[in-house]
């Protein structure tokens, strides 16, 4: 594996308006940040507006020493109002914003052709334009050993459909979902209610997936592979402050572990430890302990 290749967070660039203040948010920045903390080449790809919030995102990415490709478009920069209810984030997402209008440009094609991994979700595909761009990007990456096309489903409000989820599963070879989200897709794909392993293995068979990652909060997490391997890790006991960003830190750490040559269990263990640490911090992108 060429560790100089891009590991891409593709999707929504926005501000999380938390009770504690404004924090850089969205899948691309979160994922790319945690990739960079693993010492690999994370890059955030999205779109922002030509406005103060957009310029602020660019400044924040630079302050976090993140590589990025942020298109400037004629729409306002994305904002999400985040309220913490019992420590868990509840999202109120503004519509018709910059990241709904990401173009597939020649530079994006260059990034795709030089990427070994991408993480994308359903939220950034709520608009036809950005959905088309996500699809083009993943198709341009190609397939093969060491190429990770990660669909981190990220169900938010009403911004998803079976059509988007099914197409995304067919485009991906790694699927990340949590225990709340799997309940939502169970009737869509006639999964076995309450049986996580049967459900995840059915998804592997239906969509020719290599890996399914299932996180269950305090109840631990599972990794299921297409060769029958199962890994379970319990969730470390920590004094959680909030869980914003924990999921993306988990996914980024796991994928970086595989790219660095770790096995499934070792990569899973590292992902669990990092996600637990992120839960003890304010915001999605805390500085890692050295």
Descriptions of predicted regions:
Residues 41-122, 146:
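Conserved N-terminal subdomain of the carbohydrate kinase-like
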Residues 1-5, 193-290:
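Conserved phosphate-binding/catalytic region of the ribokinase-like
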Residues 35, 178, 247:
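Short, conserved phosphate/pyrophosphate- and ester-handling motifs at nucleotide-, phospho-/glycolipid
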Residues 110-111, 167-168, 205:
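Structural alpha-helical scaffold elements that stabilize or flank donor/cofactor-binding regions
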Residues 117, 122-202, 219-221:
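Conserved beta-alpha-beta core of the PfkB/ribokinase-like small-molecule kinase fold
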Residues 1-66, 80, 240:
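Glycine-rich phosphate/adenosyl-contacting loop at the front of the ribokinase-like
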Residues 17, 92, 185, 224, ...:
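Residues that scaffold the ATP/ADP-binding catalytic core of kinase and kinase-like folds
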Residues 6, 41, 148, 174, ...:
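Proline-centered loop/turn at the N-terminus of a beta-strand
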């Amino acid at each position: 594996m060429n560790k100089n290749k891009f590991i891409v967070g593709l999707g929504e660039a926005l501000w999380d308006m938390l009770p504690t203040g404004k924090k850089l948010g969205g899948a691309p920045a979160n994922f790319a940040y945690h990739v960079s903390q693993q010492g690999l080449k994370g890059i955030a790809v999205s779109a922002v507006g030509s406005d103060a919030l957009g310029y602020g995102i660019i400044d924040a990415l630079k302050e976090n020493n993140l590589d990025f490709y942020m298109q400037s478009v004629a729409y306002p920069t994305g904002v999400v109002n985040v309220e913490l209810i019992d420590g868990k984030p509840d999202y109120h997402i503004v519509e018709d914003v910059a990241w709904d209008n990401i173009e597939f440009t020649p530079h994006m094609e260059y990034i795709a052709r030089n990427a070994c991994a991408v993480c994308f979700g359903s939220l950034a595909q709520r608009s036809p334009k950005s959905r088309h761009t996500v699809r083009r990007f993943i198709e341009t990456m190609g397939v093969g050993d060491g190429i990770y096309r990660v669909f981190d489903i990220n169900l938010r409000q009403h911004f998803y459909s079976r059509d988007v989820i099914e197409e995304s599963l067919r485009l991906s070879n790694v699927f990340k979902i949590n225990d709340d989200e799997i309940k939502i897709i169970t009737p869509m794909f006639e999964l076995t209610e309450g049986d996580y392993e049967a459900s995840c293995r059915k998804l592997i068979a239906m969509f020719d997936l290599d890996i399914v990652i299932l996180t269950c909060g305090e109840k631990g997490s599972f990794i299921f592979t297409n060769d029958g391997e199962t890994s379970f890790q319990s969730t470390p006991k920590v004094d959680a402050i909030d869980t914003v960003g924990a999921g993306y830190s988990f996914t980024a750490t796991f994928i970086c572990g595989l790219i660095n040559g770790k096995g499934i269990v070792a990569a899973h263990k590292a992902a669990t430890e990092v996600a637990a640490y992120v839960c003890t911090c304010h915001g999605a992108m805390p500085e890692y302990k050295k």
